[in-house]
Amino acid sequence: MHRTIVWFRRDLRVFDHPPLARAARRGLVIPVFVFDRALLHHPETGPARVEFLLGALAALDADLRQLGGRLILRSGDPVQVLPELVRQSQAEGIYAHTDCERIYGRVRDARLNQALATAGMKIRWFDPPGSLPELLPYPAYRRRWYEQMGEALAPCPPQVAVPPEVIGEPLPGLAQLGHQADGKPIPAASTAAAQALLQDFLEDKADRYYWQLSYPGAEVTTGLSPHLKFGVMSVRQCVQTIRAQGDGGDPRRRRSHQQLISRLRWGQGFGQRFRYLPQLELRSLYRIFDEEGWAFDPDLYQAWQTGHTGFPIVDAAARCLQATGGYLALNFRSRAIYASFLSNLMGMDWRYGALHFMRHLIDGDCPIDHYQWAMQAGVTHCVDKTWTRIYNPGQAAVDRCDPEGQFIKRWLPELADLPPQQLGNPPRRPTYPAPILDYKAARKRRVAQLERQRQRFLHTPHLLPHLAPLPADLTPFGGDRDGGEIRWAAAPTPPLFPPALDLTSLDRTDQAALRTWFVAHVTIPPSRSSRRRPASTGEQLSLLD
């Protein structure tokens, strides 16, 4: 009987899992997860996300046991562990999904391909829906994404038969993996829990989601982000569940359903950008921004991290992140305001912000987190009319995002007695710091800096020479300063797998296709109105001035 190893990575489910379904049809299955120290101790890995991972693995094992199988756990470098498991189990080969989240993972997978080929062993890679190998213009990718989301879900195998002689390790605790719990509440990590969250959203939040998404106090997000990060539920299953629910003729629900599906597409679109350009994990899209360097003040950085900037909505986001890992409580708008403050108003390298976020976010996903950070810093879409994303963190932000002060008062109890109209610029008091910067002056400096930098390439029809290449040194940002498992970066590196775009070999058609992923090239600077917008209404918010 055929024997196939199914290597689980960020696809911790039994439903809509093509490698598992195919392996189960062939015969015996060895479902394996490898605890990889280089990922567990990556500079951006935090204990809360590892704790969620452990919960997801326990749930996956339970689901496999319901099918007659079990999850085999191993520890070590997959490049060594998996070929040895092939030999021990007498498997014919390995099935696995490709994964483009991390440069390290693509280096590891390339090395694994080499090791298996040298040993005469086989591996078959499956691209998950929404991750495409070819370079497409973004509109074509968008069409293909919707097509793939409508394709039939891979069925759950009726049985997963595991060879009885293949033995795994027991599920370790957090401390055994070298992490200590930091007090964040960890949500249930099973597929059933993810399905319940989605159903709760569709029944109780969909009539409000689109209109209240920008208000952190409303808490209308789905709560699915950590489950999607680890593939506890597939994006395709989410999309099809939303479509199957229907809107009952309610235009508000219809708009919210469309918005949520768009958010799922955006998230996978960030992953596709990283598939093309993995250097976005380490660098800004345009080389000039990193080559000129960034200011760094450790005291100001600490004030931003801990929520002591003197801007209440920024400080509330800071404290919420550290207390909750962002789960359900820290929505996109809050994250954007918090991020823009560091990179634009404080003038610090956006990568320090991404590093801090990833260490705390339970749902931290590198392409989503890093690309959004670069966008907020103004170093990605800087040839477009939306090239600046500088938020006013004062009363304007409170009026538009937290008009009743619910979010701020929850996380800043020292300001709980103030009316909402004072929460943007609270009166001085000994229990809360004064603002650490002048918003108007900081904004003026940042706009002038970005305008000067982007003039280097704004009027050229050929942006390719200005894009940052994949660096020779692949050491993760923060590794040299804050430690982590980075020894892998010192070894000779094969071409990544899946392969990245070779910027030196793109023809004009390819260059035009790549350009569409980073918005259209324009030369007209954005117009700004000095008229103050009214306080928040029931409509979805746009970017702040």
Where are each of the predicted segments found?
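C-terminal catalytic domain of photolyase/cryptochrome flavoproteins
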Residues: 211-545
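N-terminal Rossmann-like or analogous alpha/beta NTP/dinucleotide-binding catalytic cores
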Residues: 39-93, 103-107, 134
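Conserved short loop/turn motifs at secondary-structure junctions
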Residues: 73-79, 83, 99-103, 226, ...
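A charged, amphipathic alpha-helical module
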Residues: 156-254
